[in-house]
Each structure stands twice: as structure tokens, then as C-alpha cells.
Regions:
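Acidic/His-rich segments in extracytoplasmic proteins that coordinate ligands and/or metal ions
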Residues: 1-41, 112-153
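Extracytoplasmic metal-acquisition and chelation regions
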Residues: 9-46, 82-96, 155-184
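Residue-level preference for short coil/turn positions at secondary-structure junctions
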Residues: 16, 68-70, 121-122, 158
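Structural recognition of the beta-strand scaffold that forms the well-ordered cores
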Residues: 20-22, 73-76, 101-104, 126-129, ...
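Basic- and aromatic-lined ligand-binding clefts that recognize polyanionic substrates
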Residues: 47-97, 170
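Small-molecule-sensing regulatory modules
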Residues: 60-67, 95, 104-105, 113-116, ...
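Histidine- and/or cysteine-centered catalytic micro-motif in compact active-site loops
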Residues: 79-80, 106-107, 123, 131-132
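His/Asp/Glu-enriched short active-site or ligand-binding loop at hydrolase and phosphoryl-transfer sites
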Residues: 87-110, 130
Length: 185
């Protein structure tokens, strides 16, 4: 409401104020709802509904495809300083991709974690995909961790199960690419 009032004041009374659509998704269901809400605001409801159906079917098919696979524990590192785990929709993405997220909970902000937390979880897989970073920048962030003795003793590191992800392009933005993100996992 404050933002809408400020925009009306800024534009003056002689112009039609824009329609504001506030988005703050925390789960995949929220992302789907936001797609629907945007499609209504943009007067392309059928297109929005088709996209939601396509994504929902894709997630359902992916879950079916990985259902017989061994599930691995996955630590998705959303940030490196401070260390942060997966929040918002990321635990759902990891689950659809066949993993069980550690140190994160769907529908909640990404938690700050300590090395002791990561050691206690000792994940099978670590995905480094800091929010807003491409692969090259994520690789740079990873270098700051690899000299740490705590890092070297993790099962995922010892087993070569550490992956660098394009958080900016795939994981951190709430939209249609989240299906592709789950497929990548």
C-alpha cells in the first residue's frame, strides 16, 4: 500500500496509476500462484494457466522418474559468507530432483549455518549455487572454502560429489526455469 501511494503521488493525479503486483514466493505453490496472478494482471490468463499446468506436470513426471533411485542427502549452499543453506522453494526443487535437503526448509528463508552444522549433516552431495551468481562467480566463492580443513573432511568432498551451479540463471529466481533446475539436480 505504501508503494502504491508513493507511486500515485509521484505520478500525479492526471495519470492512471500502474497496477502493482506484489510477489514474494516462498514455496513452489507460491511461485505457481504468482505466475497466475501475473498472467491476470497482464491479461494473458490462459497462457499463465498453461505454463502452470506444464510446470506441474513436469514436476510430477520428474518425481516419478526418480522415485526408484537412491535418494542422497544434499546441501545446497545458497551463500558462502556467511554460510547459508537452501530455503524458500529450493528444498522442493532438490526433492523433485531426487535428493533430500539438509540444512534448509521449504517455505522459510535460507538459514545461516555453521561448519559444525554441515559436519553433523555430512551430506552425500554439495551444490554451490550462491544467490545471484553465475557459474564463474560461484567457482570463485568455492575457492574460498576449499582450503578449509572442515571442507576437506566432508563426505561429498571426499567422494567428488561437489557441484557448482548457476544460482542466478536457475535456482534463485522464482519462475518457469525452476523445473529445469530440478531436472539438473
Amino acid at each position: 500500500d505504501e508503494v502504491e501511494t508513493a507511486i500515485k503521488d509521484w505520478m500525479g493525479s492526471h495519470r492512471v496509476p500502474p497496477k502493482l503486483v506484489s510477489l514474494e514466493p516462498m514455496t513452489l505453490d507460491d511461485v505457481m500462484t504468482d505466475i497466475r496472478n501475473l498472467s491476470v494482471a497482464l491479461k494473458c490468463e490462459a497462457r499463465g494457466e498453461a505454463l502452470v499446468k506444464e510446470m506441474s506436470l513436469g514436476f510430477k513426471n520428474l518425481a516419478k522418474a526418480v522415485s526408484g533411485e537412491e535418494r542422497k542427502s544434499v546441501f545446497f549452499m545458497e551463500w558462502t559468507a556467511p554460510l547459508m543453506g537452501a530455503g524458500n522453494w529450493m528444498p522442493e526443487i532438490i526433492s523433485y530432483g531426487g535428493g533430500d535437503v539438509v540444512l534448509g526448509e521449504s517455505g522459510h528463508h535460507s538459514p545461516t549455518v555453521a561448519w559444525d552444522d554441515i559436519h553433523a549433516a555430512n551430506p552425500d552431495v554439495i551444490i554451490v549455487g550462491p544467490c545471484g551468481f553465475d557459474v564463474e562467480r560461484a567457482r570463485e566463492e568455492l575457492r574460498s572454502l576449499t582450503d578449509n580443513s572442515s571442507w576437506q573432511s566432508l563426505r561429498a568432498v571426499q567422494d567428488g560429489e561437489v557441484y557448482i551451479a548457476n544460482g542466478n540463471h536457475f535456482y534463485n529466481r522464482p519462475g518457469p526455469r525452476l523445473l529445469e533446475s530440478a531436472i539438473i539436480v
